[in-house]
Amino acid sequence: MSAARESHPHGVKRSASPDDDLGSSNWEAADLGNEERKQKFLRLMGAGKKEHTGRLVIGDHKSTSHFRTGEEDKKINEELESQYQQSMDSKLSGRYRRHCGLGFSEVEDHDGEGDVAGDDDEDDSPDAESPDDSDSDSESEKEESAEELHAAEHPDDTEDPKSKKDAKSNYKMMFVKSSGS
């Protein structure tokens, strides 16, 4: 070690080319055995150059190697469009917006009057509906629309608006907590 210091005194610049006597810093010239071990060493040091083996080509895979026919494309497009329409219909109808939280009720306008969502006379319990009741919801909506059509065709058969308002206020009062107790 002292010999190395004597050959390179402090403060003297060394040449840019490495010296032959300091071969320990030149790891590319190190004898690692066969070529496989040398490649492994270079790869582990991060200096190995990866060679393209030709095995992997982008887009060439067994699952994607077949091409779709025009009929398959049409079928897939129709399925996607039907799914899109179903989701848009459910979003725009607001059917799933009704159950936004505990005690939440959304105001709907059927005949120009503000009705509270879920004010059917047959549903007297304040319990929230379960998601399994979606079929009965659509049936009750169909019945309501049929009743509205019948009322539009026969205006003389409908109830007077005053009794209808009284029935609504009585129904709403069933859920109002009394302040006397």
From Swiss-Prot:
Similarity-based family: Belongs to the SMAP family.
Modified-residue entries (Phosphoserine), positions: 15, 17, 63, 87, 125, 145
Q: Where is the composition biased (Basic and acidic residues)?
A: 48-78, 147-169
Record key words, sorted: Acetylation, Isopeptide bond, Phosphoprotein, Ubl conjugation
**Where are the stretches annotated Disordered?**
1-181
For the cross-link Glycyl lysine isopeptide (Lys-Gly) (interchain with G-Cter in SUMO2), the position is: 13, 62, 75
Q: Which organism is it from?
A: Mus musculus (Mouse)
Q: Where is the composition biased (Acidic residues)?
A: 106-146
Q: What is this protein called?
A: Small acidic protein
Determine if Acetylation is one of this entry's keywords. Answer: yes
